[in-house]
């Protein structure tokens, strides 16, 4: 398993697509103007559990899971934990 420091040191590379923005807003029931900023703040939270599985980083905090592609740093989705 790779160190979460890799993701944290590349935090400025985080981005998402228009479809990703809509998906994240819908899944988390949020109405923020800047979804990437919202996700960055969650990932940088000291309580965030960050781990890598296969090609994705998973960031768990405040009962949500944010999925980030480990190669492109694209925020793929975010959803509440079940």
What do the predicted segments below correspond to?
Residues 1-82:
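Ribonuclease/tRNase effector modules and their secretory precursors
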């Amino acid at each position: 398993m790779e160190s979460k420091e890799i993701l944290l040191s590349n935090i400025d590379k985080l981005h998402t697509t228009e479809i990703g923005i809509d998906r994240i807003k819908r899944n988390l029931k949020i109405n923020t103007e800047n979804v990437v900023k919202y996700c960055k703040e969650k990932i940088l939270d000291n309580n965030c559990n960050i781990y890598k599985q296969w090609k994705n980083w998973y960031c768990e905090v405040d009962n949500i899971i944010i999925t980030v592609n480990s190669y492109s740093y694209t925020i793929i989705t975010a959803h509440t934990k079940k």
